[in-house]
Design a protein with these regions (language model features):
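Hydrophobic/aromatic beta-strand elements that line small-molecule binding cavities or substrate pockets
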Residues: 57-62, 82-87, 91, 122-134, ...
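Bacterial N-terminal signal peptides that target proteins for export
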Residues: 1-11
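Tryptophan-anchored aromatic micro-motifs
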Residues: 27-51
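Bacterial signal peptide processing site
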Residues: 23-25
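Edge beta-strand at a domain terminus
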Residues: 89-91, 138-168
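N-terminal glycine/threonine-rich, aromatic-flanked beta-hairpin/loop signature
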Residues: 46-91, 143-145
Length: 168
């Protein structure tokens, strides 16, 4: 009788240990992250190449269903944008999303007497696409930007833009 109780208890403990070892890897990666865009080089109309100032903020990753997630980016500049994605092993495939991007750069124009520097402020509506690789406590995003000026018809393109998010 004691042997049967001991066997049942051992079997129950083994089942609990097995269920704990099969915990959901997606769930463990949900939550809050701090992000920073490290390299943000864009080209305007295939002529002007600009390295933008870095962007920092908070990223909230929530599970929607199964392996689908909702990502909310809250920039310290005040911008908030969201997208959905899908987790496939250690990779995130992002759905493209739209956001605005403000760009400031200086151009030199020839005047009658001397060159004159002119500061240009432009806003672009861009589509952001890409994916990410998940590591223990960090996520490395590789993003692409494509868009058009809000008040002009200039085109903006950015490739291999690196964003790193670290779990809080």
């Amino acid at each position: 009788m004691k042997t049967i109780k001991f066997l049942r208890l051992s079997l129950f403990a083994g089942c609990i240990a097995l269920m704990a070892s099969c915990s959901d890897p997606v769930k463990s990666r949900m939550g809050g992250y701090s992000y920073q865009i490290a390299k943000q080089e864009v080209t305007i109309d295939d002529t002007v190449s600009i390295v933008l100032t870095g962007e920092m903020g908070a990223l909230q990753m929530e599970r929607v269903k199964n392996d689908n997630i909702l990502l909310t980016f809250n920039s310290l500049k005040g911008d908030v944008y969201t997208t959905t994605g899908r987790i496939d092993d250690d990779e995130i495939v992002l759905q493209p999303f739209e956001r605005t991007l403000s760009v400031t750069y200086t151009v030199t124009q020839e005047d009658l007497l001397r060159p004159v520097d002119k500061t240009v402020n432009e806003t672009y509506n861009i589509e952001v696409s890409g994916g990410a690789e998940m590591h223990d406590e960090t996520i490395h995003f590789t993003l692409q930007y494509r868009g058009t000026g809000v008040s002009n018809d200039k085109q903006i393109v950015g490739e291999d833009i690196l964003m790193v998010a670290k779990k809080n």
